[in-house]
């Protein structure tokens, strides 16, 4: 049985997810909570295998909560389930160790399958989010790209040549 904790500030969402996931033979919803602080308290009592985590919640948001959970309980998998797909949320959630980032438009069948895959060690990212992630990492790679330069030859370049090199480097 895969033990799941649902964290969402909207009661209707918590109840709906609990009903939907409760129909799965291999998934047990061990509890529902409304914010990140309640997640921490719930995890201290009984460790879930997977946490379905909303991003925007009162008291403590899903990104900060994900960071704390992964630092203290690295074996617990976190799937961010949210309506928000802005770059900062996506980047930070994945940076702090979320195993999945899914948008709430996902079907019940897809969500159950995502929980199973994440439980078994696979990362799950919504297709639209995957495109954003690739673009983000591409931009990061370009910014952090460093090359080795022969200092002796580089000292001979004129200012105009440096200008051309800089422009070529920027693409």
What are these regions (language model features)?
Residues 53-54, 65:
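Active-site T/S-Asp motif of two-component receiver
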Residues 35-38, 61-64:
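Acidic catalytic/metal-coordinating carboxylates
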Residues 57:
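Receiver (REC) domain active-site loop signature in two-component systems and cognate sites
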Residues 46-52:
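Active-site beta3 strand of CheY-like receiver
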Residues 8, 54, 82:
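Active-site residues of response regulator receiver
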Residues 89-95, 105-154, 163:
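Short, flexible helix-to-coil linker/hinge segments that flank and couple to helix-turn-helix
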Residues 26-34, 42:
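Short hydrophobic/Thr-rich beta-strand motif most characteristic of the beta2 strand and flanking loop
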């Amino acid at each position: 049985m895969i033990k799941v904790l649902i964290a969402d500030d909207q009661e209707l969402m918590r109840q709906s997810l609990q009903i939907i996931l409760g129909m799965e033979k291999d998934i047990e919803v061990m509890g529902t909570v409304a914010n990140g602080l309640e997640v921490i308290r719930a995890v201290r009592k009984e460790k879930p295998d997977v946490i379905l985590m909303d991003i925007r919640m009162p008291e403590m948001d899903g990104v900060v909560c994900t960071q704390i959970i992964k630092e203290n309980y690295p074996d617990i998998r976190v799937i961010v389930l949210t309506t928000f797909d802005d770059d900062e949320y996506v980047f930070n959630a994945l940076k702090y160790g979320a195993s999945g980032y899914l948008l709430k438009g996902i079907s019940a069948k897809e969500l159950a399958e995502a929980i199973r895959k994440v439980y078994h060690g696979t990362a799950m990212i919504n297709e639209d989010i995957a495109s954003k992630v690739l673009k983000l990492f591409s931009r990061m790679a370009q910014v952090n790209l460093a090359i080795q330069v022969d200092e002796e030859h580089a000292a001979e370049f004129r200012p105009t040549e440096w200008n051309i090199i800089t422009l070529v480097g920027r693409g």
